[in-house]
Swiss-Prot record:
Protein name: Myosin-9
Domain comment as written in the entry: The rodlike tail sequence is highly repetitive, showing cycles of a 28-residue repeat pattern composed of 4 heptapeptides, characteristic for alpha-helical coiled coils.
Entry-annotated residues carrying N6-acetyllysine: 8, 102, 299, 435, 613, 860, 975, 1024, 1234, 1249, 1357, 1392, 1404, 1410, 1459, 1638, 1793, 1802, 1845
A GO MF label: integrin binding
Modified residues (Phosphotyrosine): 11, 754
Length: 1960
């Protein structure tokens, strides 16, 4: 059942894959993948293709959708569903990979191969696929033999390590929560099982057990619950498992990286600290809790979220498991307790609370209970500990100074100490584990490294730890990319293989450089180290430096979140991560209070002192010097060159790790997280897709498919696979490469499957696996042969032995026969009687000699024993000496090791100091060099400036020359253009367009004058805007002045408020003191309650006023804060307005260059400016009103505070007076008490001794009563005070809520106004951006005309000078407004043209993007098809060769086709005849196929018979020789049958091929007869006749073959009958044997059951006896208790009588002393109360006695019941003993029966074996005859096949040639048509291009002509202005003159150029 459950999660359901309905559905619907927002991709059927889009119907809902063709991805056939290796997919794309992973995940298949690596998806539940049975399944198996699993990856790594002697590494990578740690555990589990030196897997070795237990310990101390993962590794580890030459584990070593120690002191919401804290608090017993001073969860400050549980995990059980793991690891109990004490100490450190002293910033510790607990746990002095934290000694120069710490510094020191302690403990634990795992002395030959490091993390708040973790993951991903993509391809190129380098674009080096680059520009870690060197450096300065240095880096961004949440953003491979740089400098430096560190080093606890043994390497407070008074611990000054930062150490550690990984052969396991909710069975497709893209899964599969992932060195290839090609390599020396080439030729591998390099042979994926299978088969054959030889040798030896035995038996028989003859002979009898008598005398002598020898031997034995004892004593002495020496040696080695460690530390320290010195010297030199370099640069710059000035002058002169040259070149250009125009005028269509353009140019010339008027109006607008800007600037200045005044008043108020707060604090302290005094007085004096109540009322009033003062102060503070906020907002507004003003200026300058459409925008802007002015004025008014209100509030608050101060002073005076009166009253009451006490003393002397005792009791009772009443009074008073306080609080709360509402309303109003302003600003900015975009487009078009504008520069200057004159003249030209409108229309047309062009441009860009996408998609498809292309190339070459022949034939056939149309019918008739013959041949083939099937079935039967015969081998083993003989004969038979079967299969295959060929040929012949019936009648007839003959021959041969086969079938049937008889005999023998074995097993089972019952009875008897003993003990204890209770009862009764007597006496005394006065009355009351109490006690005693009696009764009942049970158990034990004796008897009888059965079975077997041997001999003879007959038949069949093949091949070739020729002709014609179309399109495009070019040229010419006309017009205007007579119709006339020349763009450019000058 367990195996079936496991198979469900390992193997794919084959029925699902081979479903024909799904295959048909896929083929019919044309299913594809379409993008989906919900599920990533969804299936759809392709319905129609329309251009670049396609219409698809969604499978899920049947909805039809239009999708871009580029977004559609191909779907794989259903047979590839849930494929185990994604490299096998035919269509490799994102959708297919995601679908495959999703299908497998939903089926419970979490492992999937992806080319060379494995993809794992976290199932979030336990699967039954990690048991020992599964490990055994995967052990030693090849990858392709088993389904994907982590065990398969581990096994391949282990096998390749053993085979290649190369170190391996298994890298589990992925995000946090993807399952890396769990897979690492499974890897270790597999290796511990497979590579264990102990072969009995149930009892594993100690080392393997320790290796498995290392993980739980490290997880307990280093793992924690996070948001993403319940068991997240908060440290990285690299587990190195060492193996010896034989592959056994000899040791292990664990390296850890970057423990997140800050988690020990604080955790995020819903997260836990390290597991061990919770394990300890839940699992510790009461005794342990008291020893470790443990408290509940909520009492610890360091457990931020209290007791957070993990679902499905019990912390209590986990604690026990962890402690058990430590025991297995060999950690002694002392060290375990030391660990637990440190953990408790860390928790207690969090409970130390510091407070700020009243008048100073110094910290104090009001309650030192937590400090006492810490010092007790860590073995240090409390006073030294508190002094070290509050006033540590710091080295200043040469002296030591005690410096008082602030509260913040003390808190920081405690947290740093807690973190350091936990980290050191963790490091010690890792070293201890390594010591346990490395204790073996065997040398490791190679190792497997397993990397489990924290996954990629993106939290809400990411800090320094997350940066280090993500940096590590970047490096690992880069290693993966480098090994998979770059190194792979580089090796191909090195080895000289034909390979085109593919760039997959997965280089992560830029991101790594951003983090780790040391210089040019420095990375983040380098900048962090640099900031740690600088004094007064803060986290803020570090962030600024990062922004400055890396701001332009492509992988670096400014965060989009608020500054509170993030400081900068890095684009990692897994996504963007926002980092918050809080306390990064401190985390990087990791400073510590060295006073406490030395204290811990000197601890009385050995464990703690060992943890802190390297105190000299700590960054202490003397190194972190000069803390500023106001700054927090983030602003320390560090002394240079005194430490190495955390970042540096981690970087070095990581570099070492990467170096070791590069030296190994990496095996990648890519872990994927399916969802963030930790739900089983849920998969988020987009999340998985992102991870697949980041991990480079698709690229990895692609390179695995395209490349050659398997490679073998030449020597190794030859050595390993030479067995497959035994005779291919000649004898003698041969080069490895040549040998490999010969071997590959012999193996007949396809050339596409391999490549031969310079030193290796490269194979495609799967080829080596195939070779390995063939090698295994070959080796099995060789071994079978070897076994046969061995068995033959053994059989021969056994035969020779039998022969010797036979001869010996003959000798014995001969001797026995002789004795039988002699025994009755009388002389022989006499001889036998006399001979012993002769030997008697000799025997006596021999006995004497023997006795003497015996004495000597005994003496020798005694001497030897003495020697032996001496030797043993000597040995024991030597052993003791040896042990002493060993101990001494161990001590010496330990001392040596410690000395070595010290030496290493000193040398390391020395090296560090030397490095620091060198660094400092180098820096000094660098600084000097920089200074020199800067000075030199300064000089160079000055020289450069001079040179540049000279160059500028030269360039100006050169520019003038160039302008002259330009004019000449333009003239030449004009000539060339004129020639072009003459050539192009031939086209009639273009002439019409030219006329239209000329008309437009005429219109433009008329509109030019109107444009000039517009420019003038724009200039006016500019002046207006400038005036407005100046006004706004003046207002801003006023605002700033007002703000400054407000700042001054605010500072004054802040100062007043601080003074008031100090006074209030003093008053509060005084009130607290008064409270204490009042409490004391209340305890001493009950009479003064009324006065105290009055004082309490006054106190409440004072408290009320104080609270009011506090609320007022808080209100003032809130007002101040709001004032600050408003000031900041005003400053922001000021900045925004300034930016807007600048934008407006730029816009005004730009508007002078714009057209009429932009005038509308200007008018809008003017309106917006007016609105802005209004809003600004309103805001200024509101702001002034607010400031006035604030001032009034402040003045009122100050007055109120002053009044309250006076009131508090008055209250204080009253309280002091009340205090004095109370003290007086106390004195008076004390006197009265003294008098009363004297009276009481007199009365006490008179009373008896009993009364004295009673009085003492009563005094005690009264004191208790008094205390109770006083407490009750106090409680009532406090309750009253509480009620008053709550009332006051509620009043103040209501007031504060009202104020907050008002304040929030005001704030909301302000925010609304600000939002309105911001929206307006946004709109303006958007408009300005749009304007700029339009202008940019305009400028891009103008760039074509820049050359002409430069030429006209001089003319424009002249125009600019005349603009002033022209402006005056234009006032008179207001009548020509109509022209403006026409110009505007023209401009609109131009804008439309521009928009059209821009749209075209955008369309082209979009089309380009689409083409790019299609290009990439096609590239991918092309890569996939390249493999198929190699196969197709050969056929293409053949087709090209035949193309030429076909062209010739085609020409001939066209001429003759008409002639042979008549003869078509005749050919068709002949074809029909041939078809009938072909059908008959097909029938014959079917019959042959049936015969083949029958033969196969027979073969299977023979195989089963063989197996049965093999299984029927005798268990006893006597007739092995005969059975082996029969087996060999049967094997020979089977081999012969196999050969015959293979021959028959070959024949059948040939016939099938012939059939197929005939069918194809017939169809080809039909087509051929239709096309080419050209003079080939005779040839066809002859061929036909030949074919008929051949068919007849074939038919005859087929008939012969059928006869022979029928004969063979008959013979086979005979054989089958014989075999069946044999089988029947064997079955009967087997049945007999099975029955005997079954009986034996039954008997054995019965015996076992009996033994079990016997054991059970014994155990139960022992248990009963133990219970009886326990019951007897309980009885005795109960009896003792009963006696004790009886004694107590008697004592209670005595006490009761005494109490009753006392009561009577007291009653009498009370009756006598009733008239004594007030004192007596009081005493009476007391006595009565005492009596009542005594009565209550009596009642209680009675109740107790009753309970005791009940218990006694119950105990007696229990005793009786126990006695009865005891008797029953004794009788039961007796019965069991009798049953046991009976079972032993039965057992003996069964054994006797068993021996008898075995004898009978052996005799039966011998008889059956002899019969079988005889039958086997007969069968062998029959088989020999049959084989001979079949060989003859096979020869005949082969001859006929050869003839048939030759004929069919001839026919086939002719048909194929004809078809190929026709296809090639069709293709050629289609190609020609396509080429023609392309030519036509190209010609059209050329014509369009020429037309556009002509248009532009014409426009250029028109522009130049209009410019000339404008110049002329300007000159004429000047002349007329001088004269003073200028008519109004000049512009229109000019327009008419300018008709026929100029263009749209030129006029626009001209106008722009004209208008640009005034804007300057």
């Amino acid at each position: 059942m367990a195996q079936q459950a496991a198979d469900k999660y390992l193997y794919v359901d084959k029925n699902f894959i081979n479903n024909p309905l799904a295959q048909a559905d896929w083929a019919a619907k044309k299913l594809v993948w379409v993008p989906s927002d919900k599920s990533g991709f969804e299936p759809a059927s392709l319905k129609e293709e329309v251009g670049e889009e396609a219409i698809v119907e969604l499978v899920e809902n049947g909805k039809k959708v239009k999708v871009n063709k580029d977004d559609i991805q191909k779907m794989n056939p259903p047979k590839f569903s849930k494929v185990e290796d994604m490299a096998e997919l035919t269509c490799l794309n994102e959708a297919s990979v995601l679908h495959n992973l999703k299908e497998r995940y939903y089926s419970g298949l979490i492992y999937t191969y992806s080319g060379l690596f494995c993809v794992v998806i976290n199932p979030y539940k336990n699967l039954p696929i990690y048991s020992e049975e599964i490990v055994e399944m995967y052990k030693g198996k090849k990858r392709h033999e088993m389904p994907p699993h982590i065990y398969a990856i581990t096994d391949t790594a282990y096998r390749s390590m053993m085979q290649d002697r190369e170190d391996q590494s298994i890298l589990c990578t992925g995000e946090s929560g993807a399952g890396k740690t769990e897979n690492t555990k499974k890897v270790i589990q597999y290796l511990a099982y497979v590579a264990s030196s102990h072969k009995s897997k149930k009892d594993q070795g100690e080392l393997e057990r320790q290796l498995l237990q290392a993980n739980p310990i490290l997880e307990a101390f280093g793992n924690a619950k996070t948001v993403k993962n319940d068991n997240s590794s908060r440290f990285g580890k690299f587990i190195r498992i060492n193996f010896d030459v034989n592959g056994y584990i000899v040791g292990a070593n664990i390296e850890t990286y970057l423990l997140e120690k800050s988690r020990a002191i604080r955790q995020a919401k819903e997260e836990r600290t390290f597991h061990i804290f919770y394990y300890l608090l839940s699992g510790a017993g009461e005794h342990l809790k008291t020893d470790l001073l443990l408290e509940p969860y909520n009492k610890y400050r360091f457990l931020s979220n209290g007791h957070v549980t993990i679902p499905g995990q019990q912390d209590k059980d986990m604690f026990q498991e962890t402690m058990e793991a430590m025991r297995i690891m060999g950690i002694p109990e002392e060290e375990q307790m030391g660990l637990l004490r440190v953990i408790s100490g860390v928790l207690q450190l969090g409970n130390i609370v510091f407070k700020k002293e009243r008048n100073t910033d110094q910290a104090s510790m009001p309650d030192n209970t937590a400090a006492q607990k810490v010092s007790h746990l860590l073995g240090i002095n409390v006073t030294d500990f508190t002094r070290g934290i509050l006033t540590p000694r710091i080295k200043v120069g040469r002296d030591y100074v005690q410096k008082a710490q602030t509260k913040e510094q003390a808190d920081f020191a405690i947290e740093a100490l807690a973190k350091a302690t936990y980290e050191r403990m963790f490091r010690w634990l890792v070293l201890r584990i390594n010591k346990a795992l490395d204790k073996t002395k065997r040398q490791g030959a190679s190792f497997i490294g397993i990397l489990d490091i924290a996954g990629f993390e993106i939290f809400d708040l990411n800090s320094f730890e997350q940066l280090c973790i993500n940096y590590t993951n970047e490096k690992l991903q880069q290693l993966f990319n480098h090994t998979m993509f770059i190194l792979e391809q580089e090796e191909y190129q090195r080895e000289g293989i034909e390979w085109n380098f593919i760039d997959f674009g997965l280089d992560l080096q830029p991101c790594i450089d951003l983090i780790e680059k040391p210089a040019g520009p420095p990375g983040i870690l380098a900048l962090l180290d640099e900031e740690c060197w600088f004094p007064k450096a803060t986290d803020k300065s570090f962030v600024e430096k990062v922004m400055q240095e890396q701001g332009t880096h492509p992988k670096f961004q400014k965060p989009k979140q608020l500054k509170d949440k993030a400081d900068f953003c890095i684009i990692h491979y897994a996504g963007k991560v926002d980092y918050k740089a809080d306390e990064w400098l401190m985390k990087n430096m990791d400073p510590l209070n060295d006073n406490i560190a030395t204290l811990l080093h000197q601890s009385s606890d050995k464990f703690v002192s060992e943890l802190w043994k390297d105190v000299d390497r700590i960054i202490g407070l003397d190194q972190v010097a000069g803390m500023s008074e106001t700054a927090l611990p983030g602003a320390f000054k560090t002394r240079k060159g005194m430490f190495r930062t955390v970042g540096q150490l981690y970087k070095e550690q990581l570099a070492k790790l990467m170096a070791t990984l590069r030296n190994t052969n990496p095996n990648f396991v890519r872990c994927i997280i399916p969802n963030h909710e930790k739900k089983a069975g849920k998969l988020d497709p987009h999340l998985v897709l992102d991870q697949l893209r980041c991990n480079g899964v698709l690229e990895g599969i692609r390179i695995c498919r395209q490349g050659f992932p398997n490679r073998v060195v030449f020597q190794e290839f030859r050595q390993r696979y030479e067995i497959l090609t035994p005779n291919s390599i000649p004898k003698g020396f041969m080069d490895g490469k040549q040998a490999c080439v010969l071997m590959i030729k012999a193996l007949e591998l396809d050339s596409n499957l391999y490549r031969i390099g310079q030193s290796k042979v490269f194979f495609r994926a799967g080829v080596l696996a195939h070779l390995e299978e063939e090698r295994d088969l070959k080796i099995t054959d060789v071994i079978i042969g070897f076994q046969a030889c061995c068995r033959g040798y053994l059989a021969r030896k056994a035969f020779a032995k039998r022969q010797q035995q036979l001869t010996a038996m003959k000798v014995l028989q001969r001797n026995c026969a002789a004795y039988l003859k002699l025994r009755n002979w009388q002389w022989w009898r006499l001889f036998t009687k006399v001979k012993p008598l002769l030997q008697v005398s000799r025997q006596e002598e021999e006995m004497m000699a023997k006795e003497e020898e015996l004495v000597k031997v005994r003496e020798k034995q005694l001497a030897a024993e003495n020697r032996l004892t001496e030797m043993e004593t000597l040995q024991s002495q030597l052993m003791a000496e040896k042990l002493q020496l060993q101990e001494q040696l161990q001590a010496e080695t330990e001392l040596c090791a410690e000395a070595e460690e010290l030496r290493a530390r000193l040398t390391a320290k020395k090296q560090e100091l030397e490095e620091i010195c060198h660094d400092l010297e180098a820096r000094v030199e660098e600084e000097e060099e920089r200074c020199q370099h800067l000075q030199a640069e300064k000089k160079k710059m000055q020289q450069n400036i001079q040179e540049l000035e000279e160059q500028l002058e030269e360039e100006e002169s050169a520019r003038q020359k160039l302008q002259l040259e330009k004019v000449t070149t333009e003239a030449k250009l004009k000539k060339l253009e004129e020639e072009q125009i003459i050539l192009e005028d031939q086209n009639c269509k273009l002439a019409k367009e030219k006329k239209l353009l000329e008309d437009r140019i005429a219109e433009f010339t008329t509109n030019l004058t109107e444009e000039e008027e517009k420019s003038k109006s724009l200039a006016k607008l500019k002046n207006k805007h400038e005036a407005m800007i100046t006004d706004l600037e003046e207002r801003l200045r006023r605002e700033e002045k007002q703000r400054q005044e407000l700042e001054k008043t605010r500072r004054k108020l802040e100062g007043d408020s601080t003074d008031l707060s100090d006074q209030i604090a003093e008053l509060q302290a005084q009130i607290a003191e008064l409270k204490m005094q009042l409490a004391k007085k209340e305890e001493e004096l009950q009479a003064a309650l009324a006065r105290v109540e009055e004082e309490a009322a006054q106190k409440n009033m004072a408290l009320k006023k104080i609270r009011e003062l506090e609320s007022q102060i808080s209100e003032l503070q809130e007002d101040l804060e709001s004032e600050r906020a408003s000031r900041n907002k005003a400053e922001k507004q000021k900045r925004d307005l300034g930016e807007e003003l600048e934008a407006l200026k730029t816009e005004l300058e730009d508007t002078l260059d714009s057209t009429a459409a932009q005038q509308e925008l200007r008018s809008k802007r003017e309106q917006e400016v007016n609105i802005l002015k209004k809003t600004l004025e309103e805001e200024a008014k509101t702001h002034e009103a607010q400031i006035q209100e604030m001032r009034q509030k402040h003045s009122q608050a100050v007055e109120e505070l002053a009044e309250q101060l006076e009131q508090t002073k008055r209250v204080k005076a009253n309280l002091e007076k009340a205090k004095q009166t109370l003290e007086n009253e106390r004195g008076e009451l004390a006197n009265e008490v003294k008098v009363l006490l004297q009276g009481k003393g007199d009365s006490e002397h008179k009373r008896k001794k009993v009364e004295a005792q009673l009085q003492e009791l009563q005094v005690k009772f009264n004191e208790g009563e008094r205390v109770r009443t006083e407490l009750a009074d106090k409680v009532t008073k406090l309750q009253v005070e509480l009620d008053n306080v709550t009332g006051l609080l509620s009043q103040s709360d209501s007031k504060s809520s009202k104020l907050t509402k008002d304040f929030s309303a005001l704030e909301s109003q302000l925010q609304d106004t600000q939002e309105l302003l911001q929206e307006e600003n946004r709109q303006k900015l958007s408009l300005s951006t749009k304007l700029k975009q339009v202008e940019d487009e305009k400028n891009s078009f103008r760039e074509q005309l820049e050359e002409e504008e430069e030429a006209k520069h001089n003319l424009e200057k002249q125009i600019a000078t005349l603009h002033a004159q022209v402006a005056d003249m234009k006032k008179k030209m207001e009548d020509s407004v109509g022209c403006l409108e026409t110009a505007e229309e023209v401009k609109r047309k131009l804008q439309k043209d521009l928009e059209g062009l821009s749209q075209r441009h955008e369309e082209k860009v979009a089309a380009y993007d689409k083409l790019e996408k299609t290009k990439t998609r096609l590239q991918q498809e092309l890569d996939d098809l390249l493999v198929d292309l190699d196969h197709q190339r050969q056929s293409a070459c053949n087709l090209e060769k035949k193309q030429k022949k076909f062209d010739q034939l085609l020409a001939e056939e066209k001429t003759i086709s008409a002639k042979y149309a008549e003869e078509r019918d005749r050919a068709e008739a002949e074809a029909r005849e041939k078809e009938t013959k072909a059908l008959s041949l097909a029938r014959a083939l079917e019959e042959a196929m049936e015969q083949k099937a029958e033969l196969e079935r027979l073969n299977k039967q023979f195989r089963t018979e063989m197996e049965d015969l093999m299984s029927s081998k005798d268990d006893v083993g006597k007739s092995v020789h005969e059975l082996e003989k029969s087996k060999r004969a049967l094997e020979q038979q089977v081999e012969e049958m196999k050969t015959q079967l293979e021959e028959l299969e070959d024949e059948l295959q040939a016939t099938e091929d012939a059939k197929l060929r005939l069918e194809v040929n017939l169809q080809a012949m039909k087509a051929q007869f239709e096309r080419d019936l050209q003079g080939r009648d005779e040839q066809s007839e002859e061929k036909k006749k030949q074919l008929v003959r051949q068919v007849r021959e074939m038919e005859a041969e087929l008939e012969d073959e059928r006869k022979q086969r029928s004969m063979a079938v008959a013979a086979r049937k005979k054989l089958e009958m014989d075999l069946k008889d044999l089988e029947a005999h064997i079955d009967s023998a087997n049945k007999n044997r099975d029955e005997a074995i079954k009986q034996l097993r039954k008997l054995q089972a019965q015996m076992k059951d009996c033994m079990r019952e016997l054991d059970d009875t014994r155990a139960s008897r022992e248990e009963i006896l133990a219970q009886a003993k326990e019951n007897e003990k309980k009885l005795k204890s109960m009896e003792a208790e009963m006696i004790q209770l009886q004694e107590e009862l008697a004592a209670a009764e005595r006490a009761k009588r005494q109490a009753q007597q006392e009561r009577d006496e007291l009653a009498d005394e009370i009756a006598n002393s009733s008239g004594k006065g007030a004192l007596a009355l009081e005493e009476k009351r007391r006595l009565e109360a005492r009596i009542a109490q005594l009565e209550e006690e009596l009642e209680e005693e009675q109740g107790n006695t009753e309970l005791i009696n009940d218990r006694l009764k119950k105990a007696n009942l229990q005793i009786d019941q126990i006695n009865t049970d005891l008797n029953l158990e004794r009788s039961h034990a007796q019965k069991n003993e009798n049953a046991r004796q009976q079972l032993e008897r039965q057992n003996k009888e069964l054994k006797v029966k068993l021996q008898e059965m075995e004898g009978t079975v052996k005799s039966k077997y011998k008889a059956s074996i002899t019969a079988l041997e005889a039958k086997i001999a007969q069968l062998e003879e029959q088989l020999d005859n049959e084989t001979k007959e079949r060989q003859a038949a096979c020869k005949q069949v082969r001859r006929t096949e050869k003839k048939l093949k030759d004929v069919l091949l001839q026919v086939d070739d002719e048909r194929r040639n004809a078809e190929q020729y026709k296809d090639q002709a069709d293709k050629a014609s289609t190609r020609l048509k396509q080429l023609k179309r392309q030519l036509e399109e190209a010609e059209e495009e050329a014509q369009r291009a020429n037309a556009s070019r002509r248009k532009l040229q014409r426009e250029l010419e028109d522009a130049t002509e209009t410019a000339d006309a404008m110049n002329r017009e300007v000159s004429s205007l000047k002349n007329k202005l001088r004269r003073g007579d200028l008519p109004f119709v000049v512009p229109r006339r000019m327009a008419r003159k300018g008709a026929g020349d100029g263009s749209d763009e030129e006029v626009d450019g001209k106008a722009d150029g004209a208008e640009a000058k005034p804007a300057e």
